[in-house]
């Protein structure tokens, strides 16, 4: 299917323009009064969905481009919440959400609730991935109707946030940049603002504002692990689930400044004032030419300069965290790029990330790669799986435990029949969101009992802070005791398709402690 066909299909499924309802003609049972208006959703069977609710008072357009998100203001109006908003500006990449129509007017969220009678349901807030460059809530994978049908005792929210050069652009070093001291981390501040809206309004949807779990995958998972490090954020959530993403997905201020300078050169701009005159599509074109990876910044202001150390010092000790990774993370990218694309990608990344290593560390890396068996791509794929995803996941479990907090850790192993994909990045998403029909990555529907069990664990964690399942809650009738990660035994839950079981990390050998774990200090991504 061509991109324009996908775009129109998404519009047909979820798109449109929400309008004010001024004639009083709406179904009161589908309306929820919030601070910034009354929003009217649509019902599918026993699930009511509210799409495209703004969580800011003003959208980040015009002079508000690259400014922190603005609080909502009281509003007595009534509005449709029938359609997804446009996606944030970003590079399409692998993300369906960025194939959809894009706009700077993008800070909206969706709410999925069941009719099942209950007040104060646990709330799960989804933060999408896409390398901080792409993605969006309109992705059919993140349609949570199936999830809420199966788990009617939770409310699910999906949020959008600014991406790429709109969400993570360092500007304060420019001659007129003194009023842009937050621009390098706006995407994260958007997420905090969305969580504030949820805290203040979710009770009207049957949710418990004091029992919120944030969860995400890839950049969304990284966001989930970074948000606890932002001052004042803990009042909005109690726990987090991070699927294949951690606090390593960040950069230094020096790297941020270098990225901005490259952009300015391509666009012929010298000041923020110049940049404000540039059309969003032009910025997008420039970013795609530069191949510059825009990510959150360890600026010492919004985020600490050492995000791992912050966990070790107890920054998240009052939160429960559930983190994990997939067995063959980078194989997804091999499969997606094809041989020529992968070879180019990995050559550039190795030059960028490994060329400057000290000789003794290069020797360790080379030794690791020599021991990897498999196809031509597997040594590189395994190395980058370790440095980008697996080692950082284990390290954050370590640091959370050192800091006195609770960490639950998983290792996801089901494979696609595709010999390249195997158990690649994002392959668990169709399991989490109950979309067995979506097999583009999985190549097949995974075992139904396994899938239900994994979802039950996620929901149980959101409810209680512990993902263990008693026999009566477990789909196969067998109790699943998920141990806390600790510094001695380093126990994890192996999410094997036909044998979910706890194990010591040393038994599974998830990370190479000697030859790849040290790479986490370089914040590779």
Question: Model-predicted segments: where are they?
Answer:
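Substrate-access "cap/lid" subdomains that shape
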Residues: 97, 193, 200, 204, ...
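Alpha/beta-hydrolase-fold catalytic nucleophile elbow
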Residues: 160, 215, 230, 241-244, ...
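Alpha/beta-hydrolase active-site loop
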Residues: 170, 180-203
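Gly/Ala-rich beta-loop-alpha elbow adjacent to hydrolase catalytic centers
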Residues: 216, 220
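Short glycine-enriched nucleophile-adjacent loop
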Residues: 221-233
């Amino acid at each position: 299917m061509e991109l324009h066909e996908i775009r129109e299909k998404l519009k047909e499924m979820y798109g449109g323009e929400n309008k004010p309802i001024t004639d009083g003609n709406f179904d009161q049972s589908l309306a929820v009064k919030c601070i910034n208006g009354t929003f009217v959703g649509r019902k599918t069977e026993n699930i009511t969905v509210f799409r495209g609710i703004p969580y800011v008072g003003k959208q980040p357009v015009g002079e508000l481009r690259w400014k922190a998100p603005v609080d909502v203001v009281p509003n007595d109006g009534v509005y449709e919440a029938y359609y997804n908003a446009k996606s944030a500006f970003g590079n399409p990449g692998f993300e369906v959400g960025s194939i959809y129509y894009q706009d700077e007017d993008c800070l909206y969220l969706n709410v999925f609730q069941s009719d099942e009678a209950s007040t104060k349901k646990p709330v799960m807030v989804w933060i999408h991935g896409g390398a901080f460059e792409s993605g969006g809530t309109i992705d059919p994978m993140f349609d949570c109707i199936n999830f809420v049908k199966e788990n009617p005792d939770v409310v699910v929210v999906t949020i959008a946030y600014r991406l790429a050069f709109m969400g993570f652009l360092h500007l304060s070093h420019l001659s007129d940049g003194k009023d842009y001291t937050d621009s390098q981390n706006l995407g994260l501040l958007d997420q905090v603002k969305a969580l504030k809206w949820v805290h203040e309004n979710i009770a009207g949807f049957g949710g418990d504002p004091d029992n919120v779990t944030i969860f995400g995958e890839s950049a969304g998972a990284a966001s989930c692990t970074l948000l606890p490090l932002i001052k004042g954020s803990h009042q909005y959530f109690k726990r987090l689930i991070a699927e294949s993403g951690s606090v390593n997905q960040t950069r230094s201020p020096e790297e941020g400044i270098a990225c901005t300078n490259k952009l300015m050169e391509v666009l012929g701009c010298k000041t923020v004032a110049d940049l404000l005159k540039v059309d969003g599509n032009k910025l997008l074109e420039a970013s795609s030419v530069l191949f510059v990876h825009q990510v959150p910044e360890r600026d010492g202001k919004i985020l600490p300069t050492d995000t791992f150390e912050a966990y070790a010092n107890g920054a998240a000790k009052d939160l429960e965290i559930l983190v994990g990774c997939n067995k063959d993370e980078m194989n997804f990218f091999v499969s997606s790029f094809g041989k020529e694309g992968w070879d180019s990608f990995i050559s550039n990344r190795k030059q960028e990330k490994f060329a400057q290593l000290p000789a003794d560390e290069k020797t360790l890396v080379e030794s690791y790669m020599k021991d990897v068996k498999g196809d031509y791509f597997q040594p590189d794929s395994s190395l980058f799986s370790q440095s980008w995803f697996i080692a950082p996941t284990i390290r954050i479990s370590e640091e959370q435990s050192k800091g006195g907090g609770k960490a639950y850790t998983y290792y996801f192993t089901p494979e696609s029949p595709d010999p390249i994909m195997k158990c690649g990045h994002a392959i668990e998403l169709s399991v989490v969101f109950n979309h067995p029909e979506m097999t583009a990555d999985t190549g097949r529907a995974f075992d139904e009992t396994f899938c239900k069990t994994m979802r039950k664990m996620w929901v149980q964690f959101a409810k209680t802070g512990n993902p263990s399942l008693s026999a009566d809650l477990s789909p196969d009738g067998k109790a699943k005791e998920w141990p806390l990660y600790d510094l001695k035994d380093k126990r994890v839950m192996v999410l094997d398709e036909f044998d979910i079981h706890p194990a010591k990390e040393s038994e599974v050998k998830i990370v190479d402690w000697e030859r790849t774990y040290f790479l986490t200090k370089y914040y590779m991504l």
